[in-house]
Every structure is written in structure tokens, then in C-alpha cells.
């Protein structure tokens, strides 16, 4: 198959200099290397990419040998992280081949079979994410019509949607995220397949789904994301204890406003919002007198959080903060004037106050 090679223009100031250096170093060492995926998609749309990924024909061991400050990570997908500081690294992946190892349910459990650039294209999820940028020629290499789909604002799956979702059900979540982020349409076959295969999310480890949930809701269009998850039947496989409510939508609106204003949003706020109704219900069910005791509320919180972690992992620090937010609601609603100063000085006060209002 002959790809389209198209010279493209975008603001070169948005290119990460370290990522370009990595590509140039790999080329100098005799390998092929390209910037690939979401960073190219975002650059062509005029967005500043959050991450820059690189694909190469060098094996992880060869990449590691080329860069002193690097490490090989992963079992399911072996990657190389090239370190530039304590907080910054550039991720390099070797071209994947079409052959993969799957579980009985069809989920890819190992994808460390290496191939060519063309092989790698057809291991990617959507056409708009299968664009490779050659830093030498300033051309984008496109095997699957991704450039045209990007212009048309349409998300298309590479390959059969059902088979690709069976390989990796997280692709359904990614499809929703890109649909909202790019204000795009999903091709009909892709859209229908998400609704049909939503149950496959149960095959994904809760720890991996946690990372995807953070990506879904830490943006300025979280209400649209929530609605799409509901429409496709995905929400119940992420937050089975969560129901649609005006409270949730108001909280997500607050989240969007904070992000648009350049303020940060903690995952604890999102999880506390989504699980608040389930927590409240558990408190009511287990309260023996009119006013719930602190231990009753703690037990209710732990019950709800334990159920949630069966679907999406909540790290210990996150579950602790969520409990703090919930318990502080009762303190805020029944605040003794003598204890106001102590309450306001609590490090969780701002999150709890935003939650209350």
C-alpha cells in the first residue's frame, strides 16, 4: 500500500524540542523514527499537544542503548521512556506487527511483536491517530485517510470495530473522548458497535480504567462526556452506583469553569460527586437514629468506595480525600460557630466547600 505524503503547516513553536531531538538522534543512529498519534492530530488542529509520542523501527533495547537516560517499561506493551527531568519524559514505541497475544475474551495481553511502519499503522485505533510526521521533510505520512477524516471531523476505526473493541475495550472510551474533544461524528458502524459492546469494559483492570476516567473528566467539556457515556451505555460499566442528576451536571459545570479559568481540579472532587448519592443512600439505610454518627458515615463511605474499586480503581490517597469531602459536608451543613476557624483551616475545606455549593 502506498501512503499519502503531504507537506503540512502548523505552528512549529508547538513542537516539543526534546521530542524532535529524540527523533533526530534515532535517525542519526540509523533508524527510522516519526512523531505519531495524538500530537500530530492536535498540531494540525492548532492545539498544543500534551504529550509527544515517537514510533521507530528500533527495538526497545536499541532505543535504550541509544539514550543513556532511558528505561524500558511495560509487559503488555514494551516502551522506552527517555528522561529529560524528574517530571518529563518522551515515550518511544517500536513499530508493532499485526500479530498479538490475546486472552480467552479476545483482549490483547501482549503486543510485543515488532514490524514495519505499515504494520504499525494498522495496530492503531482510529484513522485520525494514525498520522506520522517526518521531521526531516515536514511531511505527514497517511496510510488510512486520516488527514481527510480530520478535515471532515469524523472518527473512523481502523479495522472492524467489534474485533478492535474485543482486543482493547478501552477504545470505546477513547472514541467518546475524541468525539467530544474534536466535536466530531462517529461513523455509524463505530457508534453502533460501542453500544453493543459496552459490557466488554468489565474485562479491563480497574487500575487502567482509573487513568482513562481522569482523561475523560479533567477537561472543559466534562458534561458532554458524561452525556455521551450515558447515551452509549458506558457509564454503568465505570460507575454503576451513579445515576444522572442535576447535582452531577452542576458539579461538572463547575469543573469546566475551573479548567477554563486555568484552575486545577482534583480527581477527588469528580469521584466524590459521582458517588455522593450512593454514599447518602447508604448513610440513610444504616442510620439507626435521626442523626448519623461519624462511624456510620465512615462505614458507608468505605462500603461505597469498595464497590466502586471493583470497576475503577481509587488509589488510597484518593479514597481518603473523597471520604474527607463527604464527611465535611455534614460539618458544613451543621457548623458550630465555635468550630468555624478549625473547619476553614482544614486542607480539604476548599474542595468540600465547592462540593457543597
What label would you give each PLM region?
Residues 1-357:
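Catalytic cores of the polymerase beta-like nucleotidyltransferase superfamily
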Amino acid at each position: 500500500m502506498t501512503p499519502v505524503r503531504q507537506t503540512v503547516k502548523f505552528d512549529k513553536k508547538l513542537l516539543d524540542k526534546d521530542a524532535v531531538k529524540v527523533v533526530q538522534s534515532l535517525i542519526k543512529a540509523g533508524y527510522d523514527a516519526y512523531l505519531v498519534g495524538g500530537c500530530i492530530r492536535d498540531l494540525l488542529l492548532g492545539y498544543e499537544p500534551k504529550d509527544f509520542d515517537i514510533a521507530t523501527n528500533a527495538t526497545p533495547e536499541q532505543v535504550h542503548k541509544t539514550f543513556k537516560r532511558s528505561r524500558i517499561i511495560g509487559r503488555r506493551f514494551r516502551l522506552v521512556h527517555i528522561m529529560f527531568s524528574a517530571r518529563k519524559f518522551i515515550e518511544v514505541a517500536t513499530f508493532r506487527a499485526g500479530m498479538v497475544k490475546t486472552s480467552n475474551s479476545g483482549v490483547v495481553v501482549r503486543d510485543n511483536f515488532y514490524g514495519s511502519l505499515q504494520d504499525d499503522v494498522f495496530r492503531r485505533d482510529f484513522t485520525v491517530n494514525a498520522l506520522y510526521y517526518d521531521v526531516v521533510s515536514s511531511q505527514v505520512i497517511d496510510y488510512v485517510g486520516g488527514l481527510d477524516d480530520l478535515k471532515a471531523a469524523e472518527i473512523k476505526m481502523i479495522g472492524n470495530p467489534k474485533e478492535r473493541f474485543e482486543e482493547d475495550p478501552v477504545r470505546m472510551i477513547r472514541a467518546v473522548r475524541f468525539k467530544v474533544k474534536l466535536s466530531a461524528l462517529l461513523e455509524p458502524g463505530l457508534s453502533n458497535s460501542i453500544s453493543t459492546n459496552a459490557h466488554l469494559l468489565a474485562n479491563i483492570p480497574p487500575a487502567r480504567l482509573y487513568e482513562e476516567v481522569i482523561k475523560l473528566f479533567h477537561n472543559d467539556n466534562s458534561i458532554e462526556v458524561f452525556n455521551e457515556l450515558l447515551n452509549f451505555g458506558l457509564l454503568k460499566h465505570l460507575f454503576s452506583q451513579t445515576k444522572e442528576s442535576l447535582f452531577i451536571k452542576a458539579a461538572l459545570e463547575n469543573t469546566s469553569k475551573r479548567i477554563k479559568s486555568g484552575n486545577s481540579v482534583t480527581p477527588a472532587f469528580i469521584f466524590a460527586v459521582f458517588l455522593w448519592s450512593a454514599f447518602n443512600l447508604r448513610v440513610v439505610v444504616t442510620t439507626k437514629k435521626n442523626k448519623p454518627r461519624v462511624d456510620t458515615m465512615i462505614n458507608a463511605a468505605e462500603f461505597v468506595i469498595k464497590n466502586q474499586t471493583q470497576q475503577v480503581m481509587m488509589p488510597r490517597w484518593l479514597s481518603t480525600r473523597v471520604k474527607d469531602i463527604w464527611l465535611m459536608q455534614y460539618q458544613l451543613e451543621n457548623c458550630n460557630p465555635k468550630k468555624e476557624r478549625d473547619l476553614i483551616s482544614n486542607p480539604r475545606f476548599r474542595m468540600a466547600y465547592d462540593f457543597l455549593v
